[in-house]
């Protein structure tokens, strides 16, 4: 009998000692699952929010990209326009420089070519006087000798001027040329074609291809 009571007490003690353990495990299991579910919900919410923010940021990013592209295109257009203006400005400056250099060269060549023009212009009145004097006819031997000396001087001056490119303009018998001749009279003359120089009153001269003084002439009608 005592053995049965002892066994019954031991069994009760064992049950009291072992009974709470399953309840604690269940509590632990319940307590362990709740945070996991909460974490999953939070993660899903974060993903959803991130997707929404990404969708919201996408138009902004596209707009910023479009703005940057438009700004780059505008800058490129300004650069091309400025390059074109600079190119045109360079071409104008280059053309102006070339024109200046050409004019300078022409002026220097003209100055060298016609350097005797001033001297020739000053000598023309003296040549006219020589020509008028040499037309004088005289029987006086002394006067003839003087005229011969004057003619020698006159020829020497003409030779010197010829070396510088000075020559008399042909007039009598030539068609009238307003660039070479100055008509002071017109006459009817059957011996000449109309508009032909029939008489020269004063010699004309030119230096190379430049007329220093036109010939003063009479022209047939």
UniProtKB/Swiss-Prot annotation:
Residues 1-83 are annotated as: Disordered. Participates actively in the response to hyperosmotic and heat shock by preventing the aggregation of stress-denatured proteins, in association with DnaK and GrpE. It is the nucleotide exchange factor for DnaK and may function as a thermosensor. Unfolded proteins bind initially to DnaJ; upon interaction with the DnaJ-bound protein, DnaK hydrolyzes its bound ATP, resulting in the formation of a stable complex. GrpE releases ADP from DnaK; ATP binding to DnaK triggers the release of the substrate protein, thus completing the reaction cycle. Homodimer. It comes from the Bacteria. This is Protein GrpE. SUPFAM superfamilies: Coiled-coil domain of nucleotide exchange factor GrpE, Head domain of nucleotide exchange factor GrpE. One of its GO terms (cellular component) is cytoplasm. Pfam families: GrpE. Residues 41-53 have a biased composition (Low complexity). It is found in: Cytoplasm. It comes from Geobacillus stearothermophilus (Bacillus stearothermophilus). Disulfide bonds: none annotated. Its main location: cytoplasm. Belongs to the GrpE family. CDD domains: GrpE. Keywords: Chaperone, Cytoplasm, Stress response. One of its GO terms (molecular function) is adenyl-nucleotide exchange factor activity. Residues 23-32 have a biased composition (Basic and acidic residues).
């Amino acid at each position: 009998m005592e053995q049965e009571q002892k066994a019954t007490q031991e069994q009760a003690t064992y049950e009291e000692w072992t009974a709470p353990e399953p309840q604690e495990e269940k509590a632990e299991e319940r307590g362990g699952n709740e945070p996991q579910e909460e974490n999953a919900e939070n993660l899903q919410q974060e993903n959803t929010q991130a997707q929404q923010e990404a969708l919201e940021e996408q138009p902004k990013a596209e707009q910023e990209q479009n703005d940057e592209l438009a700004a780059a295109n505008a800058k490129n257009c300004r650069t091309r326009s400025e390059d074109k203006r600079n190119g045109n400005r360079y071409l104008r400056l280059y053309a102006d420089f070339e024109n200046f250099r050409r004019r300078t060269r022409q002026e220097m060549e003209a100055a060298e070519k016609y350097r005797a023009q001033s001297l020739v212009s000053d000598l023309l009145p003296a040549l006219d006087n020589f020509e008028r004097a040499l037309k004088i006819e005289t029987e006086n031997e002394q006067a003839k000798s003087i005229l011969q000396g004057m003619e020698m001087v006159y020829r020497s001056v003409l030779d010197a001027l010829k070396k510088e490119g000075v020559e008399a303009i042909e007039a009598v018998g030539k068609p009238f040329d307003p660039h070479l001749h100055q008509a002071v009279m017109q006459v009817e003359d059957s011996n000449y074609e109309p508009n032909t120089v029939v008489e020269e009153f004063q010699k004309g001269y030119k230096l190379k291809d430049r007329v220093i003084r036109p010939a003063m002439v009479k022209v047939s009608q």
